[in-house]
Design a protein with these regions (language model features):
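Short, Lys/Arg-enriched anionic-surface-contact patches
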Residues: 9-16
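Short, basic, alpha-helical segments at the C-terminal edge of helix-turn-helix-like DNA-binding modules
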Residues: 68-74
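Hydrophobic alpha-helical connector segments
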Residues: 65, 79-106, 157-164, 188
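C-terminal peripheral helix-coil segments that are non-catalytic and often amphipathic
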Residues: 1-4, 91, 95, 102, ...
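Conserved hydrophobic residue
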Residues: 151-152
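Helix-loop "lid/cap" segments that line or gate small-molecule binding pockets
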Residues: 82, 95-103, 111-120, 194-199
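Helix-turn-helix
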Residues: 19, 23-61, 65
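Amphipathic alpha-helical packing segments from all-alpha helical-bundle domains
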Residues: 75, 103-113, 121-148, 158-162, ...
C-alpha cells in the first residue's frame, strides 16, 4: 500500500473500496453529481486516479455505490419514522410528509444531475433492496394502521401514498427547473387533512 493510500485510510479499519465510496458520496452531497470526475474523487480520497479501477469496473459502478451511500446518509440523518399505533394518524402522516420533503430536498438534486447518465441510475436501482425506500415504508405504515382499524377498511392506500409522495416531488422538482419557478410548498396540515378525508376511519 502506498503512503498516499495509507494516509487516505487513517480513519480506521475501513477498506479502500469503502473509503472511495464514502469519498464519492461526500462529494455528491457537497457538489452534486453532474461534474463528478474520477480525478476529483481520487484527489479527495488521497489516491492516484488509477486506484479506482482496482476496485470498480468503471466510474459508473463507483457512482452508483456512492449514490446509494448518499441516499442512506440522508435517511440516517433524518432519523426514524413513526410507528403504526403510536400518537395519532394525523401526526404520524405529518411526520412522514416532513421526512419525505426533507429527503427529497437532500437527494433529488443529485438524481437530477445524473439524468444524463442512465447507466448510473440503473446500477443504483439494482443495488437498492426492494421495499426499503421511503414510499415503501410509507405504504407499509398505512397498511399497518388500516390493520389496527385506525384507517378505513376500504381506503385506497396506494393512492394515498401517491398523493403524499407527489406533494414532495412537485415541491422539490419545481425548484430544480429554472424556467418553471419553484412551486410554493403545500401546508403539511392541508395535505394530511386532504388525504385523511379519503382514508380516515
Amino acid at each position: 500500500m502506498s503512503p498516499r493510500t495509507a494516509a487516505a485510510l487513517r480513519d480506521g479499519d475501513r477498506s479502500l473500496r469503502e473509503h472511495l465510496i464514502a469519498t464519492a458520496g461526500a462529494l455528491m452531497a457537497e457538489e452534486g453529481a453532474a461534474k463528478l470526475t474520477v480525478r476529483a474523487i481520487a484527489r479527495r480520497a488521497g489516491v492516484a486516479d488509477g486506484v479506482l479501477y482496482n476496485h470498480f469496473a468503471d466510474k459508473e459502478e463507483l457512482l452508483a455505490h456512492a449514490l446509494r451511500a448518499h441516499v442512506r446518509g440522508a435517511e440516517r440523518a433524518l432519523g426514524d419514522l413513526p410507528v403504526a399505533g403510536d400518537a395519532t394518524v394525523e401526526a404520524n402522516l405529518r411526520a412522514h410528509l416532513a421526512y419525505g420533503l426533507a429527503l427529497h430536498r437532500a437527494i433529488l438534486p443529485t438524481f437530477a444531475g445524473l439524468l444524463a447518465h442512465p447507466v448510473v441510475l440503473t446500477r443504483f436501482a439494482a443495488l437498492t433492496p426492494t421495499n426499503t425506500e421511503w414510499r415503501d415504508r410509507l405504504l407499509t405504515y398505512l397498511h399497518a394502521e388500516r390493520d389496527l382499524g385506525r384507517l378505513s377498511s376500504t381506503a385506497h392506500l396506494d393512492a394515498a401514498a401517491a398523493l403524499l409522495v407527489g406533494a414532495c416531488h412537485e415541491t422539490v422538482f419545481s425548484a430544480l427547473v429554472p424556467h418553471a419557478g419553484p412551486a410554493p410548498a403545500p401546508s403539511l396540515d392541508d395535505v394530511v387533512a386532504t388525504v385523511l378525508e379519503g382514508i380516515g376511519a
